[in-house]
Amino acid sequence: MRYTIFILSLLFPFLSIVAQPKHEVRAAWVTAVYGLDWPRTRATTPQTIRKQKEELIDILDKLKAANFNTILFQTRTRGDVLYPSAIEPFNSILTGKTGGNPGYDPLAFAVEECHKRGMECHAWMVTIPLGNKKHVASLGSQSVTKRMKEICVPYKREYFLNPGHPATKEYLMKLVREVVSGYDVDGVHFDYLRYPENAPLFPDKYDFRRYNKGRTLDQWRRDNISEIVRYIYKGVKAMKPWVKVSTCPVGKYRDTSRYPSRGWNAFFTVYQDPQGWMGEGIMDQIYPMMYFQGNNFYPFALDWQEQSNGRQVIPGLGIYFLHPDEGKWTRDEIDRQMNFIRKQKMAGEGHYRVKYLMENTQGIYDELSENFYAYPALQPPMPWLDNVPPTAPSALKVTHIDNGYTELTWQAATDNDQRNKPMYVIYASNDCLLYTSPS
């Protein structure tokens, strides 16, 4: 097969910034597992509860100052959660003890604080992995491996939900239902919605014999993951049609005509079919984990966009590789990738992880806040969910008050409901306003 090699020097002879769009997803993953991003303090007293909350507020304030607009807040890790659940226990990272009540609801707090800052909050849920044997043992009788053994599989010193068991999708939907019905989240974001690495050895022969219905093992496994996606997507839309459903698949879908995936891809290696999900209309956004450089990034990012069926493609960028302990990337690599994303008119990008933004690793935060995200951006519209604009407000009144401040008041329309809830954007300029400009 012939492949096209992407010559970056031709694509970007210099690292000028592509014009900022008015609509763009600017997302960051807030990782709770092991306290990688948050929290650093255990909530065991009124003082430490306040400190834990302040740590999250500091993150949100800094991201807001850089004009981020989407927070992917880790809500489920591996068989445990960061909200009071009737199904799974609290993650130990909150208090130092599995199941320990932190004295507040972290997910509700995150949603409220994001909305105060005009940012969306998406509940990031790890789906199939349940953790290693030590972690599962720490959950005791609260672990799903004890309560629903039939849907759990031990494999390579870890436990996983079994995608081939019909009850697995029901179990995951119960968790999703708790979150979507109980919280004003703007989206649910699914991680590890796939088979594990080295999946050909996954111990599901019994289920395959029972449920395959004439399909090959590869097709059956791929259909299992797609059926989970389909079931959850329809369930979310039945509850709250405006809640966005997204996932972060493996960064390479499969070999492309431009470049090979070199054996690691979503479709064949871990049985994900995200392009099929977008084509079927059962996924609103994908955040492919594009933690690659050069020809391992650009051809595959473009492939996602070309096969998106109009759904939103938001490449996840591996900014953690800017740290010398993680990789040897220079910031120019991230700059080129962000410029490419804009030039190809993708919906935006996500940054993994928040820690490296907070620490301004290689000046990445300064570059975003001062240049690339210098102006705020609105969320890209999703016309397949709702193409009816909210009714405009009325009775706009401008009042000049003390110290050079101006107060705006208006009467909100009464025919807008939760399905069509407006967010107001205020433009200000000393010159003639240009509404299409992000500045």
Question: What would you call each of these model-derived segments?
Answer:
Residues 435-439:
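Conserved small/polar residues in nucleotide/adenosyl-binding loops
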Residues 285-294, 314-381:
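Substrate-binding cleft of secreted/luminal carbohydrate-active enzymes
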Residues 182, 187, 196-249, 253-259, ...:
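Active-site neighborhood of glycoside hydrolase catalytic domains
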Residues 35-50, 128-178:
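Active-site-adjacent "subsite" loops/lids of carbohydrate-active enzymes
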Residues 374-418:
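Pro/Thr/Ser/Gly-rich low-complexity, intrinsically disordered linker/stalk tracts
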